[in-house]
Amino acid sequence: MNLSADQAPVTAVDELAPPSQPHRLSTSCDLHPEERFSGFCPSCLCDRLSVLDHNAAPPPSSSSRKPPSISAVSLKALFKPSSSGTNNSNGNGRVRPGFFPELRRTKSFSAKNNEGFSGGFEPQRRSCDVRLRDDERNLPINEAASVDKIEEEARESSVSEIVLEVTEEAEIEEDEENGEKDPGEIVEEKSSEIGEEEEELKPMKDYMDLYSQTKKPSVKDFAGSFFSAASVFSKKLQKWKQKQKVKKPRNGVGGGRPQSEIGVGRRSSDTDPRFSLDAGRFSVDIGRISMDDSRYSLDEPRASWDGHLIGRTTAARVPLPPSMLSVVENAPLNRSDMQIPSSPSIKPISGDSDPIIIIPGGSNQTRDYYTGPPSSRRRKSLDRSNSIRKIVTELEDVKSVSNSTTTIDSNSMETAENKGNQNGDKKSRRWGKWSILGFIYRKGKDDEEEDRYSRSNSAGMVERSLSESWPEMRNGEGGGPKMRRSNSNVSWRSSGGGSARNKSSRYSSKDGENGMLRFYLTPMRRSWKTSGGSGGGGGGGGGGGWEKTAAKANSHGHSIARRVMRLY
């Protein structure tokens, strides 16, 4: 019975005791032979970990050793074998339960380099803490320098934070106890502080009242404030106007150009002259004045080389775009030959089925031109265009020809004029006579040069029908390499070779009746008369002088035509 009674409390104690862990082989370390452990030596591990801690003590020796830290104690508790099987009298196998703090389950965290034990005791940071942002911002710069400091703070906080919390709680408890003991002292102190504050507030309030009464808003202050506000407003208004000015050209019509330029004239700062040739309008822009409108035309109505009316439009027919030859004919000059009309006249040909045909001009010659056969019309149109070109070149050649002429007729005219100047009483009569002769001379010269231009620019068939045969020309005196190379009389005449022979053989008065007909008989009759009159007045040889002047005018005419045609 005693055995059963003795066994009963033993079984109860065994049930209350924790379950026994399996037996582990305990080993010892050479540096620490008195400690028993399984696995790693906790003392050696603590010594290695203490190397990272700069404030840690030197490695403990067997003779003098400081008490281990909490991390060392926790490591020893984890790695030391259980003492359920054996009871050591030294007490090294069991750790006192009161020395260890109470372990509680917390949130999971990732720890390295001894941060696990410090993270459990480190207080949670608030959201308004700025240290985290600063660390993240300066992490790439101060990472190496701040790692050691963070580790030191973590290790120190593992021990010191607990002590601080305990001391704060103790201070709070002491304050509560003192408050319970002496409540009257606190009330008296508070009442005395409130009274002092009221005394301080009263003079401040009185001072504010006095200051507000003495200082009243004056008219000057009001005016100054008004002017300052007005100045600020004016500055803002100026800025707003500048912004609007900048926005206006951006929002303008015409691809960034101001609206005033369109239809009114150019208003930009570009002062260089601009010239443009268009099929529908004529524009000359010099400086800021421009005339760019299809309604205004500077072209005089005229008949072109192909028979179309160029100039102002009519209701019956829409004109064709101007050709390249119209550039030469643009100059509105007075017609000396009186063959091309200056104003169009519409003459419809009667007929029920025939369309309306526009016939410009009012002279009989123009009507004959449009009602005649097409072959003669083609030749006459070419002659007319060439006569217009000759008039253009005549303006530039009058001065040079009058100053550099070498003919006998011109010299005789000059000598006659000098003699007339010497005789004062017969000056008016002789001057009138010689002026009439000079006019006839110029008229005949113009007609002769017109015929030359018409021959040079007409078709090859017309040229060969009115000129000598090619073998005779090649075998003649003036035949040269230029004539053999080119099959055109234009280059041959412009070069100047053989012009006298051709003139004498073609245009002499003897051959005039011998089958060589002219296009315009009236100018040729004038030339015959003037040749006879000028030959009698100047002593003969007038034909040679006219031939030289015609050759010069021919060369000048070709050069001017080339200049004008370069515009395209």
Curated annotation (Swiss-Prot):
Similarity comment: family membership: Belongs to the OCTOPUS family.
Phosphoserine found at: S260
Protein role: Potentiates primary root protophloem differentiation. Regulates roots architecture.
Localization of this protein: Cell membrane; Cytoplasm
Listed Polar residues bias regions: 400-423
Tagged with keyword Phosphoprotein: yes
Topological type in the membrane: Peripheral membrane protein
Gene Ontology BP annotations: cell differentiation; phloem development; regulation of root development
Ranges of compositional bias, category Gly residues: 532-546
Designated name of the protein: Protein OCTOPUS-like
Source organism of this protein record: Arabidopsis thaliana
Region of interest (Disordered), residue spans: 1-27, 78-99, 168-203, 242-276, 360-428, 446-512, 526-558
Keywords for this protein: Cell membrane, Cytoplasm, Developmental protein, Differentiation, Membrane, Phosphoprotein
More details: Can complement the protophloem differentiation defect phenotypes of ops, brx and brx ops mutants.
Acidic residues bias (residue ranges): 168-179
